[in-house]
């Protein structure tokens, strides 16, 4: 995902998402991942037969990973070794390799197929996620947003602010305020008695 997407459940929801490696969902989807980027997919057919147990998040996650592993083995899913190597280098925050224009365009095409976004966009997404890794560090020197941004690889605050707006739709301050409101809303619902149970 490269922009915010609202998820509004129409009923009870427990397992909300499965997170693949950036280049790992192509074979499961059965189509170029660029067709799914920032969109909504009907995955009912792909999940037919999966019955995760209600009220048990660990068992739900296991049921889903077991299903995915069975499909991987049955259908012979593969990864593109060139794309995987580039993704791993990005995840390690290694500098981008120098390529000819033709090689760069070929890599972009492979990325659109296997990852759904360009290498440059994936680098931006990973850098943005690192802001939160740095911001949530439980060390006294972790500092605030500015230090988290610098630690994640941003050169200045406006650059990070642009990514906050692009990926979350908020400034860092607005997002932090929303998280406080969300925590309060969850806490206020947590301690309310539910409706009476009918026998």
Language-model region placement:
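Alpha-helical bundle regulatory/interaction domains
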Residues: 1-104, 114-119, 133-155, 171-199
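DNA major-groove recognition helix of helix-turn-helix
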Residues: 111, 123, 164-165, 176
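Ser/Thr-glycine-rich phosphate-binding loops at phosphate-binding pockets of nucleotides
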Residues: 161, 168
């Amino acid at each position: 995902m490269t922009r915010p997407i609202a998820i509004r459940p129409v009923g009870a929801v427990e397992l909300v998402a499965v997170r693949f490696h950036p280049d790992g969902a192509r074979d499961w989807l059965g189509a170029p991942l660029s067709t799914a980027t920032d969109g909504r997919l009907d995955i009912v057919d792909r999940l037919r037969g999966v019955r995760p147990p209600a009220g048990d998040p660990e068992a739900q996650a296991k049921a889903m990973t077991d299903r995915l592993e069975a499909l991987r083995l049955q259908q012979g899913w593969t990864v593109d070794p060139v794309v995987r190597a580039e993704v791993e280098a990005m995840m390690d925050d290694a500098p981008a390799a120098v390529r000819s224009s033709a090689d760069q365009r070929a890599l972009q095409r492979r990325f659109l197929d296997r990852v759904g976004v360009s290498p440059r966009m994936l680098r931006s997404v990973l850098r943005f996620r690192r802001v939160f890794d740095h911001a949530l560090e439980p060390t006294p020197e972790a500092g605030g947003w500015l230090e988290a941004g610098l630690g994640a690889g941003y050169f200045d605050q406006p650059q990070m602010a642009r990514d906050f707006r692009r990926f979350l739709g908020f400034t860092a301050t607005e997002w932090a305020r929303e998280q406080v409101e969300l925590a309060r809303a969850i806490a206020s619902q947590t301690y309310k008695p539910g409706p009476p149970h009918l026998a």
